[in-house]
Design a protein with these regions (language model features):
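Aromatic "clamp/platform" in nucleotide-sugar-dependent glycosyltransferases that forms part
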Residues: 284
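Conserved donor-binding/catalytic core segment of Leloir-type glycosyltransferases
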Residues: 157, 193-221, 234
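Membrane-proximal helix-turn-helix segments that form the acceptor-binding/catalytic region
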Residues: 134-157, 165
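A short, well-ordered alpha-helix in the C-terminal region of glycosyltransferases
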Residues: 230, 343-357, 366
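Conserved acidic donor-binding segment of nucleotide-sugar-dependent glycosyltransferases
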Residues: 316-328, 336-342
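Short hydrophobic beta-strand element within catalytic cores of glycosyltransferases
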Residues: 301-305, 315
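Carbohydrate-associated surface elements
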Residues: 162, 183
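Nucleotide-activated donor-binding/catalytic signature segment of Leloir-type glycosyltransferases, i.e.
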Residues: 246-264
Length: 384
């Protein structure tokens, strides 16, 4: 088997982007592990205000240009120009290209053919309406019809079995879908020995965007405050929806019971998790739910919606956390966990044990095996 020498990663954001989240962390961590193994890794992505046009992060060479949507145009032009020795990617000679489809593909197939792997964390049907009626319909058409047809001879990678099933529903052949699950950054040792809060604290670890449905967590805490004195909600993360949530908290009359921490460093994040009793992830769609396993490191169980897809993989229902089917059930299960320390501790202990099964080294090794297969014209399917 020929050596894998160079990989080009395409993603609309990188981990340093103000709106970067779990999917960007996945690509950066896997890319860093591949780079550490001697592979030349280049990430082409958008350029946020203040970000350098080029830099190297953890061995990954990052090349930035374009905004939220123009990133796709500039990346396609850069790839096409590189084929004739021009442009910012002219020195990149990838053996394999990873086209990360966060709703929209980079159309790398048009330039690199079968050497392209399409990485899909989850399908975006539930999120496209936020883009407006016209753009939303166009986006969903591209994601659900155009992309599967264009990439019908390409390898797909996703991060959970539910996401793989969603791809099959869009017409992608199961034989072409590999599942490479998320890894996990180890929690700082100092954060694992901190005390649990004496008063009941619920945490949400998430980007603040509409499809994460943070309002559901706010309303659940508001409903339970009269029955559970001292109940407090910590929201770790930021996003363009933040002010809407702050206003919602004010309307609920519970500004003193909610803390918006914003973007914080890893040590602070893990100290907040360590002090929490329960983690709530009310998102309407998740590819995997990295926050679930981050909370699990601290023996904090997660409650999430079954319909979110990937949470059915990251949460083992009734073992490491709880899956619910409605907001009313979310409120009911949250109250149950807050009132039942035995159940809470049992779920948390099993969640913590399971968190030890995941690492970025393992994820990168799995991804590398898929990339090697693509390099020689083969497909990989199932959990790798």
């Amino acid at each position: 088997m020929p050596a894998l020498r160079s990989v080009l990663l395409l993603c609309w954001r990188d981990i340093g982007h103000p709106q970067g989240g779990g999917s960007e962390a996945y690509l950066q961590r896997v890319g860093a592990q591949l780079a550490a193994s001697g592979i030349a890794v280049t990430l082409r992505t958008a350029r946020s205000p203040g970000a350098p046009r080029r830099e190297v992060v953890d061995g990954v060479r990052i090349d930035r240009a374009g905004g939220r949507y123009s990133v796709y145009v500039w990346a396609l032009l850069a790839m096409a120009a590189a084929r004739i020795g021009l442009g910012p990617l002219r020195r990149v000679r990838p053996d394999v290209v990873v086209d990360t489809q966060n709703g929209l593909p980079f159309l790398a197939r048009l330039v690199y053919g079968r050497r392209v792997v399409v990485l899909v964390h989850h399908c975006h049907r539930a999120q496209w309406p936020v883009a407006g009626p016209v753009l939303g319909r166009i986006g969903w058409f591209v994601e659900s019809r155009l992309s599967p047809r264009l990439n019908r001879r390409n390898q797909y990678v996703t991060v959970s079995l539910p996401s793989a099933r969603d791809l099959v529903a869009l017409g992608v052949r199961n034989e072409q879908i590999a599942v490479v699950r998320n890894g996990l950054d180890e929690a700082p040792a100092s954060s694992l020995s901190g005390p649990r809060s004496g008063a009941p604290r619920v945490v949400v670890l998430s980007r603040l965007v509409p499809h994460k449905q943070i309002e559901d967590a706010l309303e659940a805490v508001a409903a339970l405050r009269p029955q559970i004195p001292g109940l407090h909600l910590d929201i770790v993360g930021d996003g363009w929806w933040r002010q809407r949530l702050v206003d919602h908290v004010r309307r609920l009359g519970m500004s003193d019971a909610v803390t918006f921490h914003g973007h914080v460093d890893d040590v602070t994040k893990h100290h907040v998790l360590q002090s929490s009793w329960v983690h709530v992830l009310p998102s309407r769609k998740e590819g995997w739910g990295l926050a679930v396993v981050e909370a699990a490191q601290h023996a904090v169980p997660t409650i999430g919606y079954r319909c979110a897809g990937g949470l059915s993989d990251s949460i083992v229902d009734g073992v490491t956390g709880l899956l619910v089917d409605s907001h009313a059930e979310l409120v009911d299960r949250l109250e149950r966990l807050l009132r039942d320390p035995v159940l809470r501790d049992q779920l948390g202990a099993k969640a913590q044990t399971r968190s030890g099964e995941f690492s970025w080294t393992q994820s990168a090794d799995a991804m590398a095996s898929v990339l090697h297969a693509v390099q020689v014209g083969e497909f990989v399917s199932g959990v790798v």
